[in-house]
């Protein structure tokens, strides 16, 4: 079906931008609509300088604004929904996270039905599967195994419920009598250039004499490069649009990983930044069980102080578990159904990310030098 169009929500974000960069290379695509609450001026400029004949329409609007979503969805063939509030420490109020991640997704699904959009791809997260306990080991898990987060924390809960809504919407009747087909992708922890998590970590290290904070040394994870996650979304869009593949993709979820070596989060951070003189904190750290119970104690303190003071602990049991579990998943189902193979190798991903970290270090070299004196 030539002349198709795609709406990408959260398009100003870390992953959304990469999806757009790959989308404009797609065959027969006539328009990409990019939606976010606010676009930075440099992001707008990048979209307009993509060097493509494909129309790129920039829309600013709120995922909770139903009228905005209906306008954004008019005439669209595929929606790729990446907009989300990622918050594992409770910076934002619980209701705000639920509104954006769950209600926003429900609003967008309804807008698709009203505008007769036939394909919907949801960017979920591995967090919807757990880990529920740092004591339970899951290595090379897959979709045929039942893994579901039992946390009530707003981020994993909202993403889990939103994914359920997306998959339940598969087969919905559209306003024009057509059928809505949906699928969900569950990426592992995403790293790469412009990662907001890596940015925060590097800047914190530069203010601490180049010492990287140790937060996940007990973990075994399989992080995934942002370019490969973006590629998986492109393949999912192709899959839902291809009559031969669509039957196998509809209503399915897929773990998205790549060939990045399985390692701890701390080892990944060190590998990506060691070239620039950063190193892991070698001082003594609390044993994991003690750290977990300390997090529980801080949560109790926060609960009792809440009526009079908004105390937010820097870590909680969910974050301790997330950062210190042995929890990895295979991408074989995505390979089988979507034809997914990592577009970027580990060596290339490592080099690109490390070079970007180098630019961050260079920008803040004065801070590092001052701290080192």
Swiss-Prot record:
Residues of the signal peptide: none
Cellular component GO terms, alphabetical: cytoplasm; endoplasmic reticulum; endoplasmic reticulum membrane; intracellular membrane-bounded organelle; mitochondrial membrane
Keywords, in A-Z order: Acetylation, Endoplasmic reticulum, Isomerase, Membrane, Mitochondrion, Multifunctional enzyme, NAD, Oxidoreductase, Steroidogenesis, Transmembrane, Transmembrane helix
GO MF annotations in UniProt: 3-beta-hydroxy-Delta5-steroid dehydrogenase (NAD+) activity; isomerase activity; oxidoreductase activity, acting on the CH-OH group of donors, NAD or NADP as acceptor; steroid Delta-isomerase activity; testosterone dehydrogenase [NAD(P)+] activity
Residues with PTM N6-acetyllysine: 350
Superkingdom to which the source organism belongs: Eukaryota
Database matches in InterPro entries: 3Beta_OHSteriod_DH/Estase, Lipid_A_modif_metabolic_enz, NAD(P)-bd_dom_sf
SUPFAM superfamilies: NAD(P)-binding Rossmann-fold domains (SSF51735)
Membrane topology: Single-pass membrane protein
Catalytic activity, reaction form: a 3beta-hydroxy-Delta(5)-steroid + NAD(+) = a 3-oxo-Delta(5)-steroid + NADH + H(+); a 3-oxo-Delta(5)-steroid = a 3-oxo-Delta(4)-steroid
Tissue occurrence: Skin, placenta, also detectable in ovary and adrenal gland.
Cell location: Endoplasmic reticulum membrane; Mitochondrion membrane
Record-annotated membrane-spanning stretches: 288-308
GO biological process: androgen biosynthetic process; C21-steroid hormone biosynthetic process; C21-steroid hormone metabolic process; hippocampus development; Leydig cell differentiation; negative regulation of iron ion transport; response to cadmium ion; response to corticosterone
E.C. number: 1.1.1.145, 5.3.3.1
Biochemical pathway: Lipid metabolism; steroid biosynthesis
Binding of NAD(+), residues: 159
Primary residence: endoplasmic reticulum
Active site: 155 (proton acceptor)
Record's function text: 3-beta-HSD is a bifunctional enzyme, that catalyzes the oxidative conversion of Delta(5)-ene-3-beta-hydroxy steroid, and the oxidative conversion of ketosteroids. The 3-beta-HSD enzymatic system plays a crucial role in the biosynthesis of all classes of hormonal steroids.
Family to which this protein belongs: Belongs to the 3-beta-HSD family.
Name of the protein in its database record: 3 beta-hydroxysteroid dehydrogenase/Delta 5-->4-isomerase type 4
Gene: Hsd3b6
